[in-house]
Swiss-Prot record:
The keyword Phosphoprotein applies. The keyword Transmembrane helix applies. It is found in: Membrane. This is Purine-cytosine permease FCY22. GO terms for molecular function: nucleobase transmembrane transporter activity. It holds the Pfam family Transp_cyt_pur. Keywords: Membrane, Phosphoprotein, Transmembrane, Transmembrane helix, Transport. GO terms for cellular component: cell periphery; fungal-type vacuole; plasma membrane. The modification Phosphothreonine is found at T46. GO terms for biological process: cytosine transport; purine-containing compound transmembrane transport. Probable purine-cytosine permease. It is a multi-pass membrane protein. Its main location: membrane.
Amino acid sequence: MPEKLAMSMVDIKDAGSELRDLESGALDTKSSAADVYYEGVELHRTNEFIDNKPSFFNRIAAALNAETKGIEPVTEDEKNDDSILNAATIWFSANMVIVAYSVGALGPLVFGLNFGQSVLVIIFFNILGLIPVALFSLFGVELGLRQMILSRYLAGNITARFFSLVNVIACVGWCVLNISVSAQLLNMVNEGSGHNCPIWAGCLIIAGGTVLVTFFGYSVVHAYEKWSWVPNFAAFLVIIAQLSRSGKFKGGEWVGGATTAGGVLSFGSSVFGSAAGWATYAADYTVYMPKTTSKYKIFFSVVAGLAFPLFFTMILGAACGMAALNDPTWKSYYDKNAMGGVIYAILVPNSLNGFGQFCCVLLALSTVANNVPGMYTVALSAQALWAPLAKIPRVVWTMAGNAATLGISIPATYYFDGFMENFMDSIGYYLAIYIAIACSEHFIYRRSFSAYNIDDWDNWEHLPIGIAGTAALIAGAFGVALGMCQTYWVGEISRLIGEYGGDIGFELGGSWAFIIYNIVRPLELKYFGR
């Protein structure tokens, strides 16, 4: 009883003190209880009726144990992927495919290089392209941000939206090309019997396999990529054995001069684009790894996971390309069905016949492993493009991306595959601009991960505006236009290199973007403070 009486006296004393404060103006009566109340109501309304109520599609995804998280930062409590191996195998499987194999064949078949020159270009430009992928993978571990959300910090909010749009186009476009190549290879199997797979059905098979994996999200993507390289690697070993038995491989003569230099630069641009193309995806595949994970192990795991399959498949592709130049029959298969035709020529007629066709099917299906990262990232890039689009669940965007890919790939394979290939080559140039801007921001201005306030990920008032990023992007685009060398456009500078020109579009685009960004960015910081 004495204790209760004492507490009551204290309460009365405190109430009297507050009343005197109000009378003397010590408390601000304009921003007291009412404001606190409305803030509490708004917070309650937001948490209860928006954040905590999953959408219809997210409820279905959750029931199927699929990933429901979108572009929101992954908190430390949600990080449950402690496998260093996952950081390597995601890229190991994605590049142990016929797409990378086909890129390697461009050296001898398109750019006129011999085998030795092709190998040197493959090694150097792959290393140049894979380092940014390994670097950006560290950001996912440290910050828990998706790659296109991370771009808001690295390139500015406005510029990041543009990169998100280009990334959506790139994800769909590359998957369309990959499906077209695989559908053509499937179509060649059992061609003489009249029971071969129609091209439309081949496109449907590849797209269907891709959506089955990407629908379930991060965990299933990593689980699939951990083992999908095994049959592909085995099929490539069979190609090596049959190529060796054929005796048609010859290294070719070493020739120098300006024309060869132009071929080296153009082939190098294709190789760089294949390796660096994963840079705008990288952080998406490490965001669930704990912050305490060794950054050195992550970096070198990604490097190894990219380097081996890229070196292996591209060098093998270059060897097969050299062999196709030495055999008119193989060359005719290439002219009709590109590198899928060369694979068929090596494995099937006068070779392994039925087993060779089985290997062709395996390699055609390998495209699923290459398309999976693109169709997972396309959903996140679409959400990062515009706030209302982020309200559409990831699983919906994943299915929409796969549907668009299928819808485009069927007519593209029949009618305009050449246009699609040229268009996607042009899209690839933006990678150098993106890397130049992002690396400038991190290493020159932020310098450490502590300079990133994760809570600002969707705050327009705190994120960099993107003035410097946009200026650098425009300048880089001019550099690309002057340096690119494609069948439909040869830049004024690139045409000066050799007889056919030399592609220096990514070198000029990246360097010009780097220069302009570091001229404008200090001014942006000075006048806007962010």
